[in-house]
């Protein structure tokens, strides 16, 4: 599945390089028009990251996200600094289909597991942002990638399998926003190890060949941000490579 994505800072469409707020590119685009275009081209799921909210929870862009949800028919998943149940609940109440939770799952797994039990495994997607070290270990980063988390991807997945984890988004931080191609080896490995989880691949997608490579890796979906914004290819072309299931 092709999952077009936009990142938002203060209401503007942006891209960060490897998650670094100091390396920001701002696009002169309307978030709604951009998402409407992705919807019109056949996207079945849209992905929004609230980067302002990720950095400062008091400045969450909830009003804008609510407006986007109200003007689109396609299901939307939203991430960016979810730290409390109230924030999760607020997003679900305004019509977001699935909320992406990252750092908190590393820092407070018991709390996040209780949300899986309360809201169900369709409502939450775990975001596992990994740094792969020289030993090949997949270490999950936290806090907008500003600090290392110290837990391995596998240990977190095992922990959340106890609450029927179904959706997980995995980013190789070294590839994000770089257009260097996806880490297909990573996706092949985790899809083979945990076939019961719907894996969303993210980071580094530059060409339709990358889309095909991720599809062949066994991932269930691919999040594409920058490549679409700079018109490397269109959503329609990507879906032609990887038709919606």
Swiss-Prot record:
Swiss-Prot/TrEMBL GO biological process terms: L-histidine biosynthetic process; L-tryptophan biosynthetic process
E.C. number, please? 5.3.1.16
* UniProt keyword Metal-binding present: no
- Active site per the UniProt annotation: 7 (proton acceptor), 129 (proton donor)
**A GO CC annotation given for this chain:** cytoplasm
At the top of the EC hierarchy, this enzyme's class is: isomerase
Q: Name one Pfam family in it.
A: His_biosynth
Which Gene3D superfamilies does the entry link to? Aldolase class I
Signal peptide start and end residues? none
The compartments listed are: Cytoplasm
Quick check: keyword Hydrolase in the entry? Answer: no
* Name of the protein this chain belongs to: 1-(5-phosphoribosyl)-5-[(5-phosphoribosylamino)methylideneamino] imidazole-4-carboxamide isomerase
Q: Which domain of life is it from?
A: Bacteria
This protein's pathway reads:
Amino-acid biosynthesis; L-histidine biosynthesis; L-histidine from 5-phospho-alpha-D-ribose 1-diphosphate: step 4/9
What is catalyzed by this enzyme?
1-(5-phospho-beta-D-ribosyl)-5-[(5-phospho-beta-D-ribosylamino)methylideneamino]imidazole-4-carboxamide = 5-[(5-phospho-1-deoxy-D-ribulos-1-ylimino)methylamino]-1-(5-phospho-beta-D-ribosyl)imidazole-4-carboxamide
Q: Which residue spans traverse the membrane? A: none
Q: What is its main location?
A: cytoplasm
Q: Which GO terms describe its molecular function?
A: 1-(5-phosphoribosyl)-5-[(5-phosphoribosylamino)methylideneamino]imidazole-4-carboxamide isomerase activity
The UniProt keywords, alphabetically, are: Amino-acid biosynthesis, Cytoplasm, Histidine biosynthesis, Isomerase
**Organism this protein belongs to:** Shewanella halifaxensis (strain HAW-EB4)
Membership in a protein family: Belongs to the HisA/HisF family.
